From Swiss-Prot:
<keyword id="KW-0496">Mitochondrion</keyword>
<feature type="modified residue" description="N6-succinyllysine">
    <location>
        <position position="67"/>
    </location>
</feature>
<dbReference type="InterPro" id="IPR006175">
    <property type="entry name" value="YjgF/YER057c/UK114"/>
</dbReference>
<keyword id="KW-0443">Lipid metabolism</keyword>
<keyword id="KW-0007">Acetylation</keyword>
<keyword id="KW-0694">RNA-binding</keyword>
<feature type="modified residue" description="N6-succinyllysine">
    <location>
        <position position="13"/>
    </location>
</feature>
<dbReference type="InterPro" id="IPR019897">
    <property type="entry name" value="RidA_CS"/>
</dbReference>
<dbReference type="InterPro" id="IPR006056">
    <property type="entry name" value="RidA"/>
</dbReference>
<dbReference type="Pfam" id="PF01042">
    <property type="entry name" value="Ribonuc_L-PSP"/>
</dbReference>
<dbReference type="GO" id="GO:0006629">
    <property type="term" value="P:lipid metabolic process"/>
</dbReference>
<keyword id="KW-0576">Peroxisome</keyword>
<protein>
    <recommendedName>
        <fullName>2-iminobutanoate/2-iminopropanoate deaminase</fullName>
        <ecNumber>3.5.99.10</ecNumber>
    </recommendedName>
</protein>
<comment type="function">
    <text>Catalyzes the hydrolytic deamination of enamine/imine intermediates that form during the course of normal metabolism. May facilitate the release of ammonia from these potentially toxic reactive metabolites, reducing their impact on cellular components. It may act on enamine/imine intermediates formed by several types of pyridoxal-5'-phosphate-dependent dehydratases including L-threonine dehydratase.</text>
</comment>
<dbReference type="GO" id="GO:0120243">
    <property type="term" value="F:2-iminopropanoate deaminase activity"/>
</dbReference>
<feature type="modified residue" description="N6-succinyllysine">
    <location>
        <position position="60"/>
    </location>
</feature>
<dbReference type="GO" id="GO:0005739">
    <property type="term" value="C:mitochondrion"/>
</dbReference>
């Protein structure tokens, strides 16, 4: 049986993990990206501006981790969006759709009781290194 690659992905352009986990882990060609909240990577603090700015920063952080893995948003096949308030669903969708063009990833969205650091939104993703062939 051949070995499978398992590699930790990290970048200083996204916030360091705030617990005992990796920013992302690559297994073979699949990248599992930990949930990203709207933390500023330089300060480690939640960005001001509520759910709009937090969603933008969370997706920016996600993009930097994708880049560190040799991917971009086109490589994302699944996301999970966690919201402190489901009433923010439409607002987050408006921001989310600006980051994903063409084939949209599968997605689930949930309202949760609380998120780290008082965040209003957290987004995790699974990506696969390409290239892809359209079927």
């Amino acid at each position: 049986m051949s070995s499978i690659i398992r590699k930790v992905i990290s970048t200083t352009k996204a916030p360091a993990a705030i617990g005992p986990y990796s920013q992302a882990v690559q297994v073979d060609r699949t990248i599992y990206i930990s949930g990203q909240v709207g933390l500023d990577p330089s300060s480690g603090q939640l960005v001001p501006g509520g759910v709009v700015e937090e969603a933008k920063q969370a997706l920016k952080n996600l993009g930097e981790i994708l880049k560190a893995a040799g991917c971009d948003f086109n490589n994302v096949v699944k996301t999970t969006v966690l919201l402190a308030d489901m009433n923010d669903f439409g607002t987050v969708n408006e921001i989310y759709k600006t980051y994903f063009q063409g084939s949209l990833p599968a997605r689930a969205a949930y309202q949760v009781a609380a998120l780290p650091r008082g965040s209003r939104v957290e987004i995790e993703a699974i990506a696969v290194q390409g290239p892809f062939i359209k079927a």
